[in-house]
Structures are given as C-alpha cells and as structure tokens.
Amino acid sequence: MRLYDTLSGGVRDFAPLRPGHVSIYLCGATVQGLPHIGHVRSGVAFDVLRRWLTAKGFDVAFIRNVTDIDDKILIKAADAGRPWWEWAATYERAFTAAYDALGVLPPSAEPRATGHITQMVELIDRLIERGHAYCADQEGNGDVYFSVSTLPEYGKLSGHRIDDVHQGEGVATGKRDQRDFTLWKGAKPGEPSWPTPWGRGRPGWHTECVAMCEAYLGAEFDIHAGGMDLVFPHHENEIAQAEAAGDGFARFWLHNGWVTMGGEKMSKSLGNVLAIPAVLQRVRAAELRYYLGSAHYRSMLEFSENALQDAARAYSGVEDFLHRVRVRVGAVVPGEWTPKFGAALDDDLAVPAALAEVHAARAEGNRALDAGDHDAALTYAMSIRAMMGILGADPLDERWESRDKTSAALAAVDVLVHAEVRRREDARARRDWAEADAIRDRLKEAGIEVTDTGDGPQWSLLDGTDK
C-alpha cells in the first residue's frame, strides 16, 4: 500500500511500525458550534482508510480527539450566557450524531483535551528543561511559549522558511520572538484554569494534540491525519514540540482537501456553510456519505446541487441492482472485492477508481440478471457488497437499508437541531426576543421550522416531517 505523505511531499510505501498493527491519530472537532459537511469530510475520508486497513487484516487503533477547551468555545459560551463546559458538551454530542448519521465508525478512543492536562503539563516541563520553551518574561503571568529558533528544521512539514514564520497570535505579552507559539495560556478572570509550576492557566491548542497522541499511541506511531488547513500552524507546531522533546512522533502525515463553494473553503466565517440537516432534506444520509467520499481524499470537493444529486443517483443505481438480485435470486452476502478495487485503494486511497470498479460490476451484474444468469448476477452483487462496505456505504447494511426519510438519519438530525432549539428557549426565558427570533431564522435557513405549541417547541423539516 502506498500513501501520500505531506512531510516527504510524495507517495511512498506504507508499512506499520508493528507488523499487523496500525496506529492512527485524526485531529477531531473543536466543539464550538453545529457541524457542517465541511467538518465531517475528514471523518468520512479517514473512515475509509480505517475500513480498508481492517479489511486487509490489520488491527487498527484509531484515535480521534475532541478539543473541548478553546478561545472560540469560551467566547461563544460567554456570549450565550452558558457555562463553557455545557457549551462544549452540547456540540460534542452534535458532532457525534453527525458522524453516526454518516456511518463513520466510532474511534477506538475519543480523548477530550480537558482530560489530559497532566500529560500536557509534563510535556511542557520537558520542553522547558531541554531549552525549547520558556515562561513569559513578565513574572507570574503564566504564559509559556515554544522557542521556534531552537529548532532549525522548523517548517519542514509546511515548507515555511523559519525567518518568514508568523504565528498569527498577535503581539503577545512576554513573547521573546514573534515566531514563537503558545504552549500554555496564563489564567484570565472568569476563564477555566488548572495549576502548573509556572502558574494557573489552560493549554494551547497545539500542545493538546501532542499530549493526546502520545498518551494513546506512544512517542512514535504510524499516521497522523487531518484537514489540509491544519498543516500550518497546527501540525507544524505539533512536530516541533514532539521532536524537541526527543520523540519520533508520526511517520506519515495525511491531509484531506476541503469542501468548497465557489472555490472558497466552506467556513462559518465566510457564511457559506451547509448544515447537515439541510443537506439531509435533499438526499439520504447514505447518499451524502457516498458524495463526501466519492472524490479523492486529497482533492478539493466543490459542492454543487447537481453533483450532490448525481451522487445520489449513482448510489441509488447500486442499491437498485442489489435489491433486484435479492428479490429475483435470494440473499446477498458480502463476497470478495475485485483486484482492481484493491489496487485502487492501495494506491493512496484512489476512491474514484475504486468506485469505477463498483459501477462496472453493477453494469455487468444487471446484464447477467437480464440474461437470466442468476449465478453471475449473485457473484457481482456479493462483490459489490464487499466493496461498498469498505467504502462505508453498503446499501444492504442494516444502517442504510431503510428508504424511509424518518429513519435513523432523522433521529441524528434531531440531536443536531436540539442544541439550537435549547438556545432559543434560553433566550426566550431571558425575554431576549431578538436572539430567539434570530435562532429561529437561522434554523429556517437550514430548512428547519420551529413552532411554539402548548407542549413546548416542535421542529419540522419543511417537507412536513415533524419532531
């Protein structure tokens, strides 16, 4: 199997550190708000990697973290008048529901940043002792920074020259060099904080992931994955800390492309996001999964309604063939994938080529079925089930088999919407009618209507499905 490694800048042979075992760390969500389809693309892309490695016989340890302490979480929770931990927990559940709705396998472990403060403090202590980190010059303010100039190879992942680096953290009090980045943030009034040898505070984002990677996978592991927007500064700064601490860290760095609209990354700040509930009005969850996973994971996925509907039709074509075989021939169990399918996934997860094999088998299977060759049709159907299962989209899997719009996908949507409905109720309780109306309007833009009834607020999809 060959994978594109961002660090080396090319496709190279993959072999795990331990024969038969693969260790993967995927940067998960910063749980500051509801997920959109751009958020979950990495979950789908690397779920395919995990499924393929498992199908090949590897024992896969797959870690996906939750960033539950962050500047944006604190700001948004404060603006809403809610505890930061409640805010984070609410949207962590929303992300979990979104992953589940799209058939993403649960991770082997899903550590929260706040559960690993001890490991973060120990890591920072090591970096200070080795001369790669320092406490802020202002006595007792609690800030700790990584000294970029102490690591000559800094920038090797992203290609940034060390002299051109700017961390985007503004002019930080006590920072000796503007290229340096934050490891620990000194406590501020009203913010959560933890005790450390250098004062109370909370961790920096980059330190969180290094500590969690090593806590679960060790000082050296196989694959670190995430969106391409994380290459710099996040992943660059992870490498810097790990190597400065004397650890081997990740051997492969994999990065998925963005979901774009009009050539721009899908982002709340740009106002071009597509909420998952809104998309699930147009297509079923399995069809959305198929769409998000159909492009090569490293390519940009430009969203369009036509492309989404094309993907839905392609998925339905596979589904219809399998149903025809089951009705006319009998039970269809997963069989063997084709050699070309396996070769495609072994070539840096070339899902488009793998899907071409699926649709070639469907075409041949339909011809065999129409010709009355039931044995051949069944063989093709069994192969398709195996291939689509590896892609996480087997239409005959019990997860996807219901064609009813009020299936498990809608239950997941309910969890996503509940967080916003609760915020609206809180605003109404404060008699903040403007905020309550704004939340209702945002939900309506996502295709969800909220109606106040004697039994409390009820929401419905605009096609009339009530909850």
From Swiss-Prot:
Reaction it catalyzes: tRNA(Cys) + L-cysteine + ATP = L-cysteinyl-tRNA(Cys) + AMP + diphosphate
Name under which the protein is recorded: Cysteine--tRNA ligase
Any Pfam family: DALR_2
Listed HAMAP family: Cys_tRNA_synth
Molecular function GO labels: ATP binding; cysteine-tRNA ligase activity; zinc ion binding
Keywords linked to the UniProt accession: Aminoacyl-tRNA synthetase, ATP-binding, Cytoplasm, Ligase, Metal-binding, Nucleotide-binding, Protein biosynthesis, Zinc
Organism this protein belongs to: Mycolicibacterium gilvum (strain PYR-GCK)
Intervals of motif 'KMSKS' region: 265-269
Compartments where located: Cytoplasm
Residues at which ATP binds: K268
Principal location: cytoplasm
EC id: 6.1.1.16
Binding site for Zn(2+): C27, C209, H234, E238
Motif annotated as 'HIGH' region, chain positions: 29-39
Required co-factors: Zn(2+)
Cellular component, GO annotation: cytosol
Subunit architecture: Monomer.
EC main group: ligase
Cofactor-binding details, from the entry: Binds 1 zinc ion per subunit.
Family assignment from sequence similarity: Belongs to the class-I aminoacyl-tRNA synthetase family.
A single BP term in Gene Ontology: cysteinyl-tRNA aminoacylation
